[in-house]
UniProtKB/Swiss-Prot annotation:
Gene Ontology terms: cellular component: host cell nucleus
High-level lineage: Viruses, Monodnaviria, Shotokuvirae, Cossaviricota, Papovaviricetes
TM stretches of this protein: none
Any single Pfam family the record assigns to this protein: PPV_E1_C
Native source species: Human papillomavirus type 26
Keywords: ATP-binding, DNA replication, DNA-binding, Early protein, Helicase, Host nucleus, Hydrolase, Isomerase, Nucleotide-binding, Phosphoprotein
Reported modifications of this chain: Phosphorylated.
Region of interest: DNA-binding region: 176-342
Protein name according to UniProt: Replication protein E1
Renumbered ranges of motif Nuclear localization signal: 84-86
Main subcellular location: host cell
InterPro entries the UniProt entry points to: Helicase_SF3_DNA-vir, P-loop_NTPase, PPV_DNA_helicase_E1_C, PPV_DNA_helicase_E1_N, PPV_E1_DBD, PPV_E1_DBD_sf, Rep_E1_papillomaV, Znf_lg_T-Ag_D1_dom_sf
Biological process according to GO: DNA replication
Family membership: Belongs to the papillomaviridae E1 protein family.
Amino acid sequence: MDCEGTNEEGRGCTGWFSVEAIVEKHTGDTISDDETDNSSDTGSDLIGFIDDSSISDYAEQEVTQALFQAQQKQANTKAVRNLKRKLLGSQNSPLQDITNQHRQQSDSQQNTHQVNNSQAKRRAVDSVPDSGYGYTEVETLTPVQVDKQYEENGGLPSVCSQGGSNASVEDIDVDTHVNSVTQICELLKCSNVKAALLSKFKTVYGVSFAELVRVFKSDKTCCSDWVCAAFGVAGSVAESIKSLIQQYCLYYHIQCLTCNWGVIVLMLVRFTCAKNRTTIKNCLCMLLNVPETQLLIEPPKLRSTAVALYFYKTGLSNISETYGDTPEWIVRQTQLEHSFDDATFDLSKMVQWAFDHDITDDSEIAFKYAQLADIDSNAAAFLKSNCQAKYVKDCATMTRHYKRAQKRSMCMSQWLQYRCSKIEEGGSWKEIAKFLRFQHVNFIYFLQVLKQFLKGTPKHNCIVIYGPPNTGKSQFAMSFIKFMQGSVISYVNSNSHFWLQPLEDAKVAVLDDATYSCWLYIDKYLRNFLDGNPCCIDRKHRSLLQVTCPPLIITSNINPQEDNSLLYLHSRVTVIPFPNTFPFDSNGNPVYALTDVNWKSFFSTTWSRLDLEEDADKENGEPLPAFKCVPGENTRLL
């Protein structure tokens, strides 16, 4: 029933309304002084009395806004109702399966029913029964079918169900979003997630991820270059990763392609330092906001030309973003001038490198020379060869031959100069003099003994350092042998016929901690060794060799000159006693530093007193000409 005084402006509305007043005048009513009964009321005096222009505009705007809110609320309610009806009402809905898994996890019969439902979802589209709600076809449509219908309808999306009902535009948007979420849920439920990721990567990028990378089984293995693939990344995050990752790397190559899972990001990254897979996973999970199960991380194939060409060509296109300097392994395999540097392997260059760096061990040669492959073309050719073990063995053998011949060609003075040239400056000879004074050894007497010792004078070819334990005998002898690059023999191997074989190429040798049985062995078999005369030693798998015993230092807790049973050794050894315990400071460091730099300073200072020969060609350069086993090259232009 209408209210009196209204003009049906709209039921239930809160807008403005007009009211018409009815005034009746009866005869005999008193008229006020300011009113004239006879005057005609035209209303001209009330024009502009009330300004209702702004009020009417505001009223119209408020009515429009209220109507829009009501319509928007109605549309939202309808969309939510349709979504609930579609996802929760259909038996084929993936969310319905997830709900059943949580509700019926403990029931074995229901688990069997879930397996049947998961198998039913893999059937063909035409075998799916109609749910009766008009959304069956929408659930089974793939994104490709939706795109085709979008193009056929001229850009207006429409999907028809089997019952003939039309879905609204809002339903299509909701279904597309739910479809991508459903795909990720299906990925998480896969028995082999990595296989699903590899398949999707090859489908989207057209190249297998395994063709671009080499596999690291351990997550703790470090590498500076990594290939990373991230699945299901949000579009805004995929764009921001290009700026966020710059602080962690020196170079990156990023590609972003979209599929029904979201954005798949492919990255080739060179980090500022070597990192392992675990560290990179934590970093990318934070930057991309994706779980670890949606990441593939492996190092690239550095020696594959196809991989280098792939990243080089895609880097030139507009589908990728690059930052920093291109890695050298890509440049070397893609640019023409670098391809000319690839040469065949030359063993002489490898031998020259090992000789210059004084490396004679097989394993050390193989390891260190392989690390030069990025900067040395011959090392790169060595890695490409199938005969690396043979080359390493031949290189070590030839290097030892050259080193042995070089050492034999030097006298003691030349060898001391050569050893001093390999050691840096900055030592102090006073450290050695202070230690000898601490052990009550006359410094002048020690220089006289050392002079005859270095010359190999018969009967003065052996120095014995004896004293109580912990007096620094072995420290003093070993530091001297290290500087001279001498050899060490051990009495523990005396049962072998070859325990004296290290004396074959030694300039100086040491026998540490000789016991009483060792002295008896020396007195019985090695008297001529202590004399410094030529003798014969046995070598394994080789013929006997006649050599002159090098100067020998023996450390012992026994003084052979005080033992009458060793009478024949008294004239063959020079004894230097060390009676005092070796001192250390409060931090455990030795008070007297017996280092190579101090020994170099010692010999440089006492060179003339030791009566060592001066090299006549020393002013013109090195004491010996540089060894060169690589043929020279003519660099002159034609």
